[in-house]
Structure formats: C-alpha cells, structure tokens
A protein has these predicted regions:
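Short C-terminal tail/terminal secondary-structure segment
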Residues: 94, 240-277
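Residue(s) in the substrate-gating loop at a strand-loop-helix junction
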Residues: 140
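Alpha-helical segment proximal to the catalytic Tyr-Lys
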Residues: 125, 169-173, 237
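Conserved mid-core segment of classical short-chain dehydrogenase/reductases
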Residues: 68, 91-106, 129, 149-152, ...
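Active-site helix of classical SDR
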Residues: 120, 156, 164
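Short, small/polar-rich loop/turn modules that mediate ligand/substrate recognition or access, typified
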Residues: 172, 177, 182, 239-241
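Catalytic Tyr-X3-Lys loop
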Residues: 98-117, 132, 136, 160, ...
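C-terminal helical subdomain
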Residues: 180, 200-235, 239, 246-248, ...
Length: 277
C-alpha cells in the first residue's frame, strides 16, 4: 500500500523546487494534492501531467482569500484536508540592515511568515472538524545558524519556527500535528537564481561543486520531499512541535580538519588502542 494512500494535501509553492518534488512524491504515494502557486503556467502544466490526483489553484500566499480558496478546493473536491504544507517562499530583502527598504522588509515577512500563518489559520478549522491533520512549515537552517542566508530572510524563517512550535502546542489536543522542516542548500530555482528553469538543469549547473558541509553534495528537492512525506504519513502521529533539519550536516558545523588543510598530512588520525598504548 502507498505511504499516504487516500490522504489530501495542499502544498503552497507547489509548482517548482521543493514544492514540485513534494507534489510528485505525494501523488506517487497515493495522495490527492492541490498545487497552490502563483506560477500559473508551470502549476497548470504540472497538474495536467499528474492527472486527476492533482489540481492547480492559483495562490499568492499573502492574499488570505486565495489561501482559503485552495483549502476550500481540497475540501470541496475530496471532502477533507490531511496535510497542509506551507512551503512557498522567496529570497526576500537583501543587503545590510541599514539599507533595507521598509517595503522589502514587509514583503519578506508577508510571504514567509504571514503566508504560513494564513495557511495554518484556514487549515486548522478543517482539521479540528475531522479530528486529525498534519501541518508542515518550511523553515531554513538560516533560522538556526547565523550567516546562512540574507538577514531579513533569516529572521523571518526564525519566526516561522517559533510560530510552528507554539501553534503545535495549541492544537495538540485536537490530534493536529505541526512541524517544521529546515532545508540547507537545496538545488532549487530560489537558491540558484534560476527561476523558471527546469530543476534538472539547476542540478546540472551545481553538479560537481563542493559545499561547506559534512555531506559535500548539493541537496536535492527530493531530500526535503521525503521528510515531508514522513510528516504527512501515519508514521509520525506522535511527532509534533519539532524542527527537522535536512542540510547534509551544514548546521552542525564543518569538521575542524576540513577547514585546516595543513593538518591533512597527519591523516589518518591515530586511534588510541589500550592494548598497544
């Protein structure tokens, strides 16, 4: 039996990158999915490719009526909402704090934080009525380690993590789970400044490049989709209020000797053997 057979999900930012990978995986694993995205052509094309299991709904996550419409569409078509994946995002305001325009700061928080808030606001009443549900919010390792992303983006993602945790506590007695996923560097249009290009092309551009993390390969959207699948499935019914870091070990730091090439000549490191001294 498929992992999430018969479940219904709404995935914001579902037309590309992590969202697209998750849509594809969820459909493969038996779910029905609303692809909620502002990329109309790409979202509609993906839905057409996947057939009856996926429906596209144009959504700009700052607009409350559009977020609600996507959730209503899921309930109208399939009678329920098992998973709300608040994943839509963008890089946000750039530059030093003193140079960030207020309107760009506001837009960054509107998309990254308000978008998550609106998704949870309208998903929770449906889930309370049916007595179960899983909410997944996309954070970032920049929310837990400084210097991993633009400063306003990092602050907004930190807000997403705390909003996820406090919301999880408030709805746990309703059997609604709320968790966050913190991706590291993932080969997506957002991270590689290649919006509109196929994900395969993005991976090819990044192939062979090294990354400052214990697992040196670039992360792939499917890596995050697999974690989302776990959180949407019945395997995680006792998991809530948690932040799952999927980053190749980046947030854990870099092994000291990797940063100090001069010491590589001393490898392999001698392991103490109590029998030989």
């Amino acid at each position: 039996m498929a992992e999430i057979e018969g479940k219904v999900a709404v995935i914001t930012g579902g037309a590309s990158g992590i969202g697209e990978a998750t849509v594809r995986l969820f459909v493969t694993e038996g779910a029905k999915v609303i692809i909620a995205d502002m990329q109309i052509e790409r979202g509609a094309s993906l839905a057409a490719e996947l057939g009856k299991a996926a429906v596209f709904c144009p959504v700009e996550v700052r607009q409350e009526d559009q977020v609600k419409a996507a959730i209503d569409m899921a309930v109208t078509r399939w009678g329920r909402l098992d998973c709300m994946f608040n994943n839509a995002g963008f890089g946000g305001a750039l530059g030093p704090i003193e140079g960030v325009p207020v309107e760009e700061f506001d837009m960054t928080f509107d998309v990254l934080v308000k978008g998550v808030f609106l998704g949870m606001k309208h998903a929770i009443p449906v889930m309370k009525k049916q007595g179960t549900g899983s909410i997944i919010n996309t954070g970032s390792i920049s929310a837990i380690t400084a210097g991993r992303g633009p400063l306003v983006y990092s602050a907004a993602k930190a807000a997403v993590l705390h909003l996820s945790t406090v919301t999880a506590l408030s709805v746990a007695d309703c059997s609604i789970r709320v968790n966050a996923i913190c991706p590291g560097y993932i080969a997506t249009p957002l991270s590689s400044n290649t919006v509109g290009k196929p994900d395969k092309l993005i991976e090819e551009q990044l192939e062979g490049k090294s990354f400052p993390q214990p697992i040196p390969r670039v992360g792939r959207p499917h890596d995050i989709a697999e974690m989302a699948l776990f959180l949407a499935s019945d395997r995680s019914t006792f998991v809530t209020g948690q932040n799952f870091v999927v980053d190749g070990g980046a947030a854990s730091g870099v092994f000291w000797e990797q940063q100090n090439p001069i010491y590589k000549k001393y490898r392999p490191i001698r392991v103490y053997n109590p029998d030989k001294g």
